[in-house]
């Protein structure tokens, strides 16, 4: 049996008893959400599990609840009726104004959940996708999870920024059937300004995936005023230069639908304005 240590999340989580587990030396993430019948997270019909915690601070982040590793309550004021007897209970809130982001799942429970839809995966070439946050922040746990998925006959996809130590990439290669890396900006200064981190390690990791001849689909989010203009062409040029075919690159349109989440979480809204991107 693996030794288990527990670390409290602190008062900010506002949920007594909510814990983050460590199995051996592997950090175990909380799950911010699960999505069944996902059709944009890899091939076929999939179940996507979203971990909580990300080392990047993208100004356009459309899932701000995924940045912190700790559990967070969100109160959607436009739904809240401010009941005097409010118990801060997501399950009993009559207007669904309360939502808890960050719940503990065991690997066995996640695999069991995914297997509920295995007939759909088998018919469509689908499977399980691990997204975030940033799954590689918890790469030891992610390895164990994907190994369990593979043992259960489930196809695995990893949705990642690739901002992780090279060791994480090497360890995940044998258990990951397909990679879905984001490539946010080609210019390093631009990348650092809008995400809080350099893209140098990301590029090295991406080149490692190409060298390993993995199946991948690179996602390029086009954010007006941030990563449009010359950076679109620069990203395409770089990806071609390292051997990634155009058919394996997808441009994603930017939306600012997440503004209500920032308000509900008590976070500063940093999302750029939604407008037409510049293309040179």
For each feature predicted by the language model, list its residue ranges.
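Glycine/small-residue-rich loop that forms an oxyanion/phosphate-binding "nest" at active or ligand-binding sites
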Residues: 90-96, 102, 106, 113-121
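Conserved AdoMet/S-adenosylmethionine-binding subsite of the radical SAM
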Residues: 108-264
